């Protein structure tokens, strides 16, 4: 779950979002097979949520995190994963993600250096940290990078990743693992099917 992304691979405005989406580990192949469900949830306790935010400089060590904060964070993460999943399929196959709103996480425009406007969270604490993540999504959307945040098509992976393909049609978090496993399975099915038809 702490698979860190090399800095040059994901644009800065979606790096934090990508890490947040991957606090849920749905991989079930290889070393991940048989992993207990509670270990798949990186935000399984208020303490784990606090540690995740503190580790990324989004929260001070003195901030107390409770179960309601954790549930809010999981809800935001799951909604963003659903939106990234919508980015992963052709437009004609998408479910409508419109209508989601996070009214309890206000964002404000602040003018920083050289009167440059910035979108920032209007609160502190956990809500402020979540607001920062949502602000990054808005910035990424304006730069065209949010549409490249996807969920791996491999049902035994479901890792969130940034699609680097020129055509923006990547399906796998890594071709050398998930893509190759898919191609191998497809080849074996095809081979079995042709052997069955011949016999």
Regions found by a protein language model. Give the residues of each.
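Basic DNA-binding region of bZIP-type proteins
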Residues: 177-194
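Solvent-exposed, flexible loop/coil residues
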Residues: 20, 123, 165-166, 191
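Histidine-centered nuclease catalytic patch
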Residues: 158-166
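Cysteine-rich micro-motifs
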Residues: 168-179
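Short acidic, gly/pro-rich beta-turn/loop elements at beta-sheet edges
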Residues: 31, 162, 183
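Residue-level signal for short amphipathic helical patches enriched in basic/charged
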Residues: 144-147, 164, 179
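Short helix-coil boundary/hinge micro-motifs
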Residues: 1-151, 158-159, 196-199
